[in-house]
A protein has these predicted regions:
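Two-metal-ion RNase H-like nuclease active-site motif
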Residues: 2-11, 170, 366-368
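Conserved "right-hand" nucleotidyltransferase catalytic core of DNA-directed polymerases
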Residues: 10, 187-198, 204-376, 500-539, ...
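Short catalytic/ligand-binding loop motif for oxyanion handling, primarily in non-cytosolic enzymes
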Residues: 15, 105-110, 177, 375-376, ...
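Short secondary-structure boundary/capping segments
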Residues: 20-22, 113-118, 244, 380-385, ...
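Intrinsically disordered, low-complexity coil/linker segments enriched for acidic/polar
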Residues: 26, 46-55, 431-434, 805-808, ...
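Conserved DEDDh/DEDDy metal-dependent 3′-5′ exonuclease domain
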Residues: 36-182
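Helical catalytic core of nucleic-acid polymerases
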Residues: 179-181, 199-203, 337-499, 505-507, ...
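C-terminal, non-catalytic extensions of nucleic-acid polymerases
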Residues: 290, 494, 528-824
């Protein structure tokens, strides 16, 4: 018998409704239900059809799915009532596994309250103990729960006597969407769901009998969205089940962050021998941190500008939690052709847009990432929260890092062996070999696959744990909280990465991008030996390991928005015989890395904005397909393609949302819901705009998309022509490719000498007398690194004349007039 369901609860002053749909509901039935419901929406929007027949068809489909809907309702005026309470209790005779959205903070609690109160209810649903109807009791708790927020269940005094007849899984919590306050409607838009509907009747209204159907129908839509979400995240759900089995910790109802915490806690408890209850509520608060007290003595630079930076950083004091700019850790400076930002989130370069193709510049575009940068940094700089034991914590970090690497390599090795055996099995089958030989090989292959999967799960679980540690240092609610750890790790690692950038630039190797734990360089053929020497020295000196990737193309808008095409893609693409979308997508997964606005799949916690634009940009930049062609033709690729032109907008409750349009020559205002989906339409067909009006300042009106005609598309309506304004989407592509205006460069506009890639920066040459200025030199031939005492404190000067080492702009101008060399 199926005991796993998706569910959702709706509560009004005189109505309690709950819908359950089996997790195993046949997808074909769901698809038919959606098709029927789309016809219902079309009728509601003016198309012809028999709505009552379609409602009956929907009811039959829900029955075929195994859906359950229970209603408790009373009309205080007419005396009519409905009480499905006994049916709800029958439903819970067997323990159920329920999955909801935000259910941990609401639906689960409301079910608990109902089940606990059931024993006091009469046949109509009145609570004999409190002299209230159960719907009123639930409504009061519902309002209190929403107002209170997370943790309302702790206020319920019956829990110690109550045994819950179900297990609740909250998919919002599992996917960490509760932390970003992502609503189910926002998720539905990202899932390209056909029906985006907010509550049909205000939550504080009394429900009439004729309204019950609309509430139930609305709730079915929400439950189906939740089911669609869970099915789309199958890999995440299965990962939690596998990690639970592998580590012996139940993480099935946890976000990735909580999984990491659970694994780390288990390991620290094991290595320290301290019971978790004795350290889970500990932390180290700090007010001020002197940066000089946390800097590594190994941080040294050869150039004046970076030595000045080091001194300035060392002299600074961080005020934890301060909102003042002067108290924060943030520095901007120019080095080489790049402008860098040091901040709490890591080192980043301020990258200009452009296209870089290795074959055209006759050089290698190489990305080097530091393996396990932050975990290794924690160990290298001896970082541990002051309130925890040093050695057990270091053992926890070391075990997590090393075991993850071992498990990752073991999984990869076994997978290769499995593939080899798989090919052998197929060869034997084709040659009609003895079945016993095939069976033996198959058994070995199955064992390898099982072992590889276990190692992969272990590696993934430990990766989650290790990635979380750094963030936990600055989470005031976590037992790893110690802000000093955060700054000790990030500041030292950023300066350490700058050491690599410096030695590369001093060898004439251009660094064109830096992002947290890696850098991208342009390397001429004659520079390969120098590049290797620089990287080898840096790895040995800092005890870090670099991982290298060569790119055929590096196409970027900025540091966080780019397409990186790995070496070998074009050759693999040319050899691809069957260039189906599926085959190309598989190839792209192997060779292409996208970030930011070039990712076509929109994250649930991000605003939904026209996926057709990144699709058009990708096809243009990778396959030379004119972006205008994609914008105009994609709409004909499928019935669902209209979603790729849509934009979403969620507005605050303090605003009224109005769709203002011209209908038959007259101004027409239609009130919209808080979450809306729309697309840009041809003004000659549909002249309308979405405006938001501040309830407290009615005269203050803002348009959602200025200077454009928009058409709401909350309900999917199939049309032969949606009258899309293609020019809007083409302009969005053009802004990225050619710049928003004359002052803002685009990717294509600076294609020539990208990033000054082949230019010489003489001011980056080491000074001739390092001892005189308190700098140091690196001799790569004998690996002899000598450090000189720091020079006198000099503040950072980011002006052009300051970078060249002049004390004033006048001195710099005189040097130019005299024809002096502008070296350090």
């Amino acid at each position: 018998m199926n005991n796993a369901y998706e569910y959702d609860v709706e509560i009004y002053p005189n109505l309690f409704e709950v819908t359950f749909i089996p997790k195993t509901a046949d997808q074909k039935l769901i698809d038919v239900y959606k098709a029927v419901d789309i016809r219902c929406l079309a009728i509601k929007n003016g198309k012809e059809g028999n709505l009552e027949e379609l409602k009956e068809a929907k009811a039959k489909l829900l029955l075929a799915m195994g859906a359950k809907q229970f209603v408790i309702w009373i009309d205080y005026t007419t005396g009519k009532w409905r009480n499905d309470g006994p049916l709800i209790m029958d439903f819970f005779i067997q323990h159920k596994i329920l999955t909801g959205y935000n259910s941990n903070n609401y639906d689960k609690i409301m079910l608990d309250i109902f089940i606990n109160n059931y024993k006091y209810l009469d046949v109509k649903g009145f609570n004999k103990k409190e002299s209230k109807h159960i719907t009123q009791i639930l409504y009061d708790h519902s309002c209190a729960c929403v107002d209170f927020g997370k943790g309302y269940s702790r206020l319920l005094n019956f829990k110690k006597y109550y045994k819950r007849p179900f297990t609740d899984y909250d998919i919002q919590k599992i996917l960490y969407l509760d932390k970003t306050y992502t609503s189910l409607k926002q998720v539905a838009i990202c899932l390209k769901w056909y029906r985006i509907q907010n509550l049909p009747i205000a939550y504080n209204c009394r429900i009439r009998e004729e309204d019950i159907y609309d509430i139930c129908d609305y709730n079915v839509n929400d439950v189906l969205i939740t089911l669609e979400l869970e099915r789309s995240q199958k890999a995440e759900i299965e990962l939690r089940e596998d990690i639970s089995e592998e580590f012996g910790i139940d993480v099935r109802n946890m976000s990735r962050s909580s999984i990491g915490k659970a694994i780390t806690t288990s390991l620290y408890e094991k290595f320290s021998g301290i019971d978790r209850k004795d350290f889970m509520d500990t932390k180290t608060d700090r007010w001020k941190i002197k940066v000089s007290s946390i800097l590594s003595p190994k941080l040294k630079f050869q150039t004046k500008i970076l030595n000045d930076l080091l001194r300035t950083v060392a002299q600074s004091t961080i005020v934890v939690g301060s909102t003042k700019d002067e108290d924060k850790f943030k520095y901007e400076f120019q080095f080489g052709d790049a402008v860098y930002t040091m901040a709490l989130g890591g080192l980043h370069s301020q990258d200009k847009p452009g296209l870089l193709i290795a074959s055209e510049i006759g050089a290698c575009i190489r990305d080097c990432d530091v393996a396990s940068f932050y975990p290794n940094g924690i160990l290298s700089y001896d970082v541990y929260p002051e309130h925890l034991e040093r050695n057990p914590f270091r053992a926890t970090v070391g075990y997590t890092k090393d075991t993850r690497v071992e498990a990752k390599h073991a999984a990869s090795k076994e997978l290769k062996e499995y593939k080899k055996l798989f090919n052998e099995i197929n060869t034997f089958k084709n040659n009609h070999a003895n079945q016993s030989i095939i069976d033996d090989l198959q058994a070995k292959a199955d064992a390898l696959m099982k072992s590889s999967k276990r190692h992969k799960i272990k590696a993934e679980g430990l990766k989650i744990a290790i990635n979380r540690m750094y963030g936990a240092f600055r989470d005031i609610n976590d037992y790893l909280y110690d802000p000093k750890c955060t700054y000790k790790v990030t500041i030292n690692l950023q300066l350490c990465l700058l050491m690599l950038i410096e030695v590369l630039e001093l060898k004439g190797i251009k660094v064109i991008s830096a992002n947290t734990d890696g850098i991208i360089c342009i390397i001429k053929p004659e520079q390969e030996a120098d590049y290797k020497a620089c990287c080898d020295w840096w790895q040995e000196y800092n005890n870090f390991e670099l991982e290298f990737t060569n790119y055929e193309k590096y196409l970027r808008n900025d540091v966080n928005n780019y397409i990186a095409v790995k070496e070998g893609f074009q050759d693999a693409y040319d050899k691809l015989i069957d260039k189906t979308p599926e085959a190309i997508a598989e190839l792209e997964d192997i060779y292409i890395k996208r970030k930011g606005l070039f990712i076509e799949t929109i994250a649930f916690n991000k605003g939904y904005a026209y996926p057709v634009v990144p699709k058009a940009l990708n096809l243009f930049l990778l396959y030379n397909v004119p972006y205008a062609d994609t914008i105009e033709n994609h709409i004909h690729s499928s019935k669902e393609a209209i979603y790729d032109y849509c934009i979403s907008q969620k507005t605050d409750a303090k605003f009224n949302i109005i769709y203002r349009s011209i209908v038959n020559g007259e101004l027409h205002n239609e009130e919209l819901q808080k979450s809306n989906r729309f697309y840009i339409s041809d003004v000659s067909y549909c002249s309308g705009t979405i405006i938001k009006i501040d309830k407290n300042k009615p005269s203050k009106i803002n348009r959602i998309v200025a200077k454009c005609s928009v058409r709401p598309f909350n309900d999917y309506i199939e049309e032969d022509d949606y009258h899309i304004d293609f020019s809007y989407y083409k302009k969005e592509c053009a802004k990225i490719l050619y710049g928003k205006n004359k002052k803002t460069a685009g990717m294509v506009a600076v294609q020539g000498d990208l990033f000054g890639a082949m230019s010489n920066n003489k001011h980056l040459e080491p000074i001739e007398s390092p001892e005189e200025d308190g700098l140091f030199e690196v001799d790569f031939e004998d690996d002899n690194v000598s450090f000189i005492n720091p020079a006198n404190d000099i503040p950072i000067n980011n002006t052009i004349w300051g970078m060249y080492g002049f004390s004033s702009e006048e001195e710099y101008k005189r040097a130019i007039e005299n024809g002096d060399d502008l070296t350090f």
